Amino acid sequence: SWNRLVSLELNVDNAWASYESDVMMKFQTLPDLHEIVKGFAKHEIAFFEQLFIARQAASGALVAKNVGDFNKAQSALAQLTPRFNALSEAYPEVKADSHFLDLSRRLVRIEERLADRREFYNSEVTIWNKAIQMIPTFIIAAVKGSQQRELIDVPDYYHQDYKIQF
């Protein structure tokens, strides 16, 4: 029914908003980490530029609710994360900095929440996509102009071992 489709669509939008909120928290934490590390690793400026270009692309796609572009930007950002962690390992004074430790822990908690929210969003999208393809709701979905939604990808990086190269 029409009401069921409206309800399902609102569930997808709500799940996206929850995910978006945590991604924005992550994006707000990254500049703080950047400021701490850049004081110790000034010769890594090119890396930090890559990190923030990827962050801006992901942020723009997130605000535009463009899941496809967000998936691409998030993948680029995820590939830079191990290098960021390696920088903290390479500079013991960074690793010992209490602000860095606090922010790193915060980032880990945010990443854990993001994984949960991504799973919830993808579940809601799957329910939505199934509903708009089934009889008789596909007729109502067509009248309503409903379209399939994209899932949030888990970047390939998370499924493989990563070797850090400088």
Which residues does each PLM region occupy?
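A helix-centric hydrophobic-segment signal that preferentially recognizes long
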Residues: 1-166
